[in-house]
Amino acid sequence: MSTSETNNIKAPNHVTEYDSVTNNIVVAALYKFTRFADFEEYREPILNIMLDNEVKGTLLIASEGINGTISGTRQGIDNVLEYLRSIDAIGSFTFKESYTDAQPFYRTKVKLKKEIVTMGVENIDPLQSVGRYVKPSDWNALISDPDVILIDTRNDYEVKIGTFQNAVNPNTETFREFPEYVAKELDPAKHKKVAMFCTGGIRCEKSTAFMREQGFEEVYHLEGGILKYLEEVPASDSMWEGDCFVFDNRVSVNHNLEKGSYEQCFACRMPITQAEMQSPAYIKGESCPHCIDKATDEQKARFREREHQMQLAQKRGEAHIGSDVIDVIEKRKAAKIEARRQADEANKAKAD
């Protein structure tokens, strides 16, 4: 997704489309780098508009912009996006949609951050310098060039379940490790053409800006990220292999942007296959083959209790959500009760 402003485009026929009966949950991924000096003042208003419209997910806001993924009904998502556009510092922005039959988030969060995507390097500004955007329709030709080194900027656990043909995996656990990878493994004199990609485009805004600052001149990145590529490029023409990891309860999406074949270990958050779920090391909510030997007994006990609470909530037909949202909901309920009480007293006073 570039910082240029365009409207969302209807998905091609090969992608699962919105259906008011079945695929009736809209999942909207968005970001925008912008000068957002008074961002702290908008945390509560944004959270309230999300709660009012029963929209779930997480939005990060910082002085450098906004980033996140939200989900809800068609009307709910439209209302939240309309409000975000009404904020002067944000204005118009591009976003990507996919559709599912179940709410992929449990919680509603708006977080104040130092960065909307954390690289941990001072003074990296995508509004000043960024790589060259490459549209999905032109991506295959670029990455087929033997002079181009193709780098997946995502974390190792994301790369392992799907990536582009011939892409380099930096083997990072977090995006903060990417600058160190560049310093150790890449050289502007040797790597003349560098192409980069990530899930939705935001990490590449930072990584290409960083690369240019390090002296790499010919740096490209996939506009709109993997999700836009999967949306626009038919599977028959695709150079993508596997699923794409997403940061919600779907865990991954396939080439049609439908829920993929992976589940997630709620203890370590790693994506796991159906085969791994048959392993003796897999205990739902507690451990999997990736973390069975890493968690302490205390951690496992905490994971068991969390799973127990989630099961109880599910039986009650409720979502097991965090205390931050519960606090906000309770405060708003209390405020409404107090407002009604004051209105009743005012009406009684008039009657007297």
UniProtKB/Swiss-Prot annotation:
Listed GO MF terms: oxidoreductase activity, acting on paired donors, with incorporation or reduction of molecular oxygen
GO biological process terms, alphabetically, are: tRNA modification
Query: One matching Pfam family, short form?
Result: UPF0176_N
Under InterPro entries, the record lists: Rhodanese-like_dom (IPR001763), Rhodanese-like_dom_sf (IPR036873), TrhO (IPR020936), TRHO_N (IPR040503)
Disulfide pairings? none
Residues in Rhodanese domain copies:
144-238
What name goes with this protein?
A: tRNA uridine(34) hydroxylase
